[in-house]
């Protein structure tokens, strides 16, 4: 059973589409919806590391050993700052980390709310991509959220590997876990000269069955 929070539903669904299964979790109040959901999904391999600084370095070693992307997830506010050293090292070592930071409603920023700092773009030049997801209220928000997650995941190995940051605001973190199926999501594939034969074969099949074909050549 999954969280009712749609942004986290989309994240989990797209992680599965991209085949990203290793998650290093530092559980806190605002990332419980993600933590509980992936722990109950047998697709994911979860590692519990309470201290965020230690979790970041554990994920670095895991990514380096497995040669795969690794997710790190924490609660909001200063907990996110503890990832900084590992994020910087991942950037300069070219290691693909997905940094998931839970956040509060942006309307509450600067209003003396507890556990809230400005987390948007907080890792600055030390990530390849940083996105701030919308709080989903309608179909347009769902589309935008899905697009941003895809953009972040595509950058993990675009022109070299490295970390990406996905910030996840929410109005309430008191999520129930009654959702049986994840939403259908669209994985966006980047095709270039280094793509494997399977991806090229899929696109060749699509072209052969299309009524109108336009091929545009240029530099990526």
List each language-model region with its residue ranges.
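N-terminal alpha/beta PP-like core and its mobile active-site loop of ThDP/TPP-dependent enzymes
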Residues: 1-220
């Amino acid at each position: 059973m999954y969280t009712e929070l749609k942004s986290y539903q989309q994240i989990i669904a797209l992680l599965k589409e991209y085949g990203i299964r290793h998650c290093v979790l530092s559980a806190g109040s605002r990332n419980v919806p993600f933590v509980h959901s992936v722990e109950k999904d047998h697709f994911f391999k979860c590692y519990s590391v309470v201290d965020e600084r230690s979790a970041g370095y554990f994920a670095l070693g895991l990514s380096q050993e497995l040669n795969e992307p690794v997710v790190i997830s924490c609660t909001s506010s200063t907990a996110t700052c503890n990832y900084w050293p590992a994020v910087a090292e991942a950037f300069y070592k070219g290691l693909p980390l997905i940094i998931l930071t839970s956040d509060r409603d942006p309307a509450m920023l600067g209003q003396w709310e507890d556990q809230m700092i400005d987390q948007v773009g907080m890792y600055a030049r030390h990530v390849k991509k940083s996105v701030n997801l919308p709080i989903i209220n309608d179909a347009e928000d769902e589309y935008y959220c899905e697009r941003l997650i895809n953009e972040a995941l595509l950058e993990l190995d675009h022109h070299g590997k490295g970390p990406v940051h996905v910030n996840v605001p929410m109005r309430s973190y008191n999520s129930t876990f009654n959702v049986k199926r994840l939403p259908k999501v669209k994985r966006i594939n980047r095709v270039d000269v280094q793509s494997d034969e399977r991806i090229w074969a899929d696109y060749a099949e699509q072209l052969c069955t299309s009524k109108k074909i336009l091929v545009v050549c240029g530099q990526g």
